[in-house]
Amino acid sequence: RRILGEGVPQHRIEQLVVETFASYARYWVDSFRLPQMPVQAIDEGMNFVGVDHIWRAVDAGVGPILVLPHLGGWEWAGFWLSLVGGFDVTAVVEPLEPPDLFDFFTAFREELGMHIVALGPDAGAAVLRAINEAHVLCLLADRDIEGTGIEVDFFGERTTLPAGPATLALRTGAPLLPTACYFKPTGGIQCLVEPPVPVRREAKRLREDVTRITQDLARALEGLIRRAPEQWHMQQPNWPSDYDALEAIGKPHPRPGQP
């Protein structure tokens, strides 16, 4: 309802909830299917809009930062960029439990040419190295997992989003490219790469510039998600009011940064 607004009938909301779980199931099916797919099939299933923004950055010798929501099938695009586009691709991912599941996903992503960095203390150095080596860097940025992010307005409510994309762009000059990869009804993926979000120093304090740019990214992510809200796989609480509501019914969920 945050995405669609108050005027949308309840039955439509319920229908989209069902479609969201169907989309999430498709994500998992594709995840297990992609390693067995021939490169030609990955190429034929991909419609890439805005890939010129990526080429422009790499040709200039700097790795672009693709800022993505947890939506659709971003891994298909990552494999296409690596196997068909010939790019070096680095993705920062959330560690999964149990560790065997994380190791499985890391292995199949690396098998198809992606470099995987686990979110954690060593991630910063790894992503700086990737940008300097002109890798395409994929950052999922619609959820503040560590609880150390920037407060923004996101779909009409205050929450926090990761500071990493804006901070990296300010420090390296890497372009920030809002990106989303949508499931097509007939199979395959349509990936949309938008023009760069403006990145420049304006304030005396770096934190103020990071806040401004992160808010701009939040607005860009809103637009991408609204194109296909049923494909947004946000299956966890993401706003303070979500946690408050769960606590009110006796089902508390750890807040970001809490064990």
For each feature predicted by the language model, list its residue ranges:
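Short, flexible segments with low predicted structural confidence
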Residues: 29-30, 80-81, 102, 140-142
